[in-house]
Amino acid sequence: MNIQDLDEFLHIDTSGEKWHLKHPGELSPFYAHLPLHNYQNMQCYYFDFANTLKTDQIGVVKESRYTTIPPHYHKDMELNYIYEGTCTFIINGKEVTMNQGDLCILDTNVVHS
């Protein structure tokens, strides 16, 4: 994949992104089946990437745009790269705004949104 193909791929609205554009401010139906956990004195979701990482130790995911991801944690490390624009994260209760070209590596069990 060359840089032009990557750029085109990243700008295509996924079905999830189309849903979020039609339902601004609403929590994705994905969360309806996930229980909330009391973790570090917070109500948050636990994400299990067992299926994503079933055959490989590393998974690559294009995160949905146009949405807010609620507080969550997982047993896997996470690397976020801001390809374009800005994104505000809450990491361990601290607001962090990232810009194009920024990289963030989260350790295991770090609550973030």
Feature map (PLM): residue ranges:
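Generic protein-terminus/edge-of-domain signal
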Residues: M1-C87, V96
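Short, flexible loop/turn elements at secondary-structure junctions
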Residues: Y81-Y83, D102, V110
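Short beta-strand His + acidic residue motifs that chelate non-heme Fe in jelly-roll/DSBH
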Residues: T88-I90, L106, H112-S113
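Short acidic-glycine-tyrosine-enriched beta hairpin
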Residues: G93-T108
